[in-house]
């Protein structure tokens, strides 16, 4: 049994659909999802006893964690979630266990490891204004292109140079953290994916594959790969 910790999104209106989408993607990949409340004091316990981790989408991380003042366009942070996720990531990094981050999950992974974010794409990267980064209408209908860089883990998983992604965000990775590299880019150069440079399974995706994984086999692959990597790590330790 491979136990995958899945961080709660926190929005009561979205809990059922997010639990369903994320949980079903983990189950289809052969894992058992364990949904994690925002309790920093439990981070070390989860890091020790679970096999892999899925950091989910949600609101904007507090810019102070990456050394910036908050811009007017930045969303209101959720301190409890920031504190829990940063504590959990710190504990997980010490174990070497696999991590997959989706949307906010990619962003908080980058922040936890020392990277920075674009707080608001429309105001800070106007050249990307036409890429529909907050297109809620297309959450379940991939139509946003992303170029997958050759020689990356993501490229080996997806088997394509370009993907059509469903994009619902206004923030993105700016400077990748030390030990992380860009693995996917939008046409305007917005980071759509990051991964570890040392070969361990640390993968962040800016789009929402969980929303379409039930009908698009390729979008299921990151979740299946997370479970596989978690199983392999467990067998080796």
Feature-to-residue mapping (PLM):
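N-terminal beta1-alpha1 cap of cysteine-dependent amidohydrolase-like domains
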Residues: 1-100, 111-112, 118, 122-158, ...
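Conserved G/P- and acidic residue-centered "switch" motifs that form tight phosphate/ATP-binding loops
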Residues: 103
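Active-site-proximal beta-strand elements of phosphoester/diester hydrolases
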Residues: 203-206
């Amino acid at each position: 049994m491979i136990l995958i910790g899945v961080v709660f999104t926190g929005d009561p209106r979205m809990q059922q659909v997010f639990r369903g989408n994320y949980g079903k993607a983990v189950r289809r990949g052969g894992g058992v999802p364990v949904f994690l409340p925002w309790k920093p004091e439990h981070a070390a316990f989860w890091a020790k006893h679970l096999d892999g981790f899925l950091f989910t989408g949600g609101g904007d991380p507090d810019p102070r964690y990456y050394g910036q003042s908050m811009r007017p366009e930045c969303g209101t942070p959720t301190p409890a979630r920031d504190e829990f996720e940063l504590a959990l990531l710190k504990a997980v990094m010490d174990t070497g266990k696999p991590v997959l981050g989706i949307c906010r999950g990619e962003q908080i992974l980058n922040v936890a490891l020392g990277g920075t974010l674009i707080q608001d794409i429309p105001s800070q990267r106007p050249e990307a204004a036409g890429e529909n980064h907050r297109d809620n209408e297309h959450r379940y209908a991939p139509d946003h292109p992303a170029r997958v860089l050759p020689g990356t883990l993501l490229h080996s998983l997806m088997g394509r140079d370009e993907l059509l992604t469903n994009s619902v965000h206004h923030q993105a990775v700016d400077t990748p953290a030390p030990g992380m590299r860009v693995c996917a880019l939008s046409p305007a150069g917005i980071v759509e994916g990051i991964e570890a440079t040392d070969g361990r399974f640390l993968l962040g995706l800016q789009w929402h594959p969980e929303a379409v994984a039930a009908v698009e086999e390729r979008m299921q692959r990151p979740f299946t790969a997370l479970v596989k990597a978690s199983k392999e790590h467990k067998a080796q330790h």
